């Protein structure tokens, strides 16, 4: 490896950590301000009714779920809709960290069903101009990725 390649790899890893932290910050803020829609079906309903209010779509999946054909079909349809409506999309791994961020119980004791965290939408109503540092950082990362022909960028949320 050349020095330039080593620096590029180091910069990419640094950027990934920065964007990952921005996504975490954004999700917590969006949930606190009731700007987060959770679940594949709930997200599809919202995008059908008011796609202009959606500013970011997170598609979350871990490696062991990659073979779930139904989920992949849902993701393909959601990605298509997001591209058509100029909604930023990010693929995310680290479902356990995602659940932790959103305050999901560690174990469901059979009393409550865990929420579907595979699709998350961050909304920004037309009457409000909410700008969070996390949203700006993630939007910038998405734009930069599209410039590199990576239409659906990927980040990994790290366990803590």
UniProtKB/Swiss-Prot annotation:
It comes from Bos taurus (Bovine). The keyword Transferase does not apply. InterPro entries: GADD45, Ribosomal_eL30-like_sf, Ribosomal_eL8/eL30/eS12/Gad45. GO terms for biological process: apoptotic process; cell differentiation; positive regulation of apoptotic process; positive regulation of JNK cascade; positive regulation of p38MAPK cascade; regulation of cell cycle. Gene3D superfamilies: 3.30.1330.30. The keyword Isomerase does not apply. Keywords: Apoptosis, Developmental protein, Differentiation. Involved in the regulation of growth and apoptosis. Mediates activation of stress-responsive MTK1/MEKK4 MAPKKK. Belongs to the GADD45 family. GO terms for cellular component: cytoplasm; nucleus. Interacts with GADD45GIP1. This is Growth arrest and DNA damage-inducible protein GADD45 beta.
């Amino acid at each position: 490896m050349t020095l330039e390649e080593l620096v590029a790899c180091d910069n990419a890893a640094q950027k990934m950590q920065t964007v990952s932290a921005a996504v975490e910050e954004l999700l917590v803020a969006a949930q606190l301000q009731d700007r987060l829609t959770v679940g594949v079906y709930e997200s599809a309903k919202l995008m059908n009714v008011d796609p202009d209010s959606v500013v970011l779509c997170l598609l979350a999946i871990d490696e062991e779920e990659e073979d779930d054909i139904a989920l992949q079909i849902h993701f393909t349809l959601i990605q298509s809709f997001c591209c058509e409506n100029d909604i930023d999309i990010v693929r995310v791994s680290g479902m356990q960290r995602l659940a932790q961020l959103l305050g999901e119980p560690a174990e469901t004791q059979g009393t409550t069903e865990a929420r579907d965290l595979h699709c998350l939408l961050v909304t920004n109503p037309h009457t409000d101009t909410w700008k969070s540092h996390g949203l700006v950082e993630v939007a910038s990362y998405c734009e930069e990725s599209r410039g590199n022909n990576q239409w659906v960028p990927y980040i990994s949320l790290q366990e803590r």
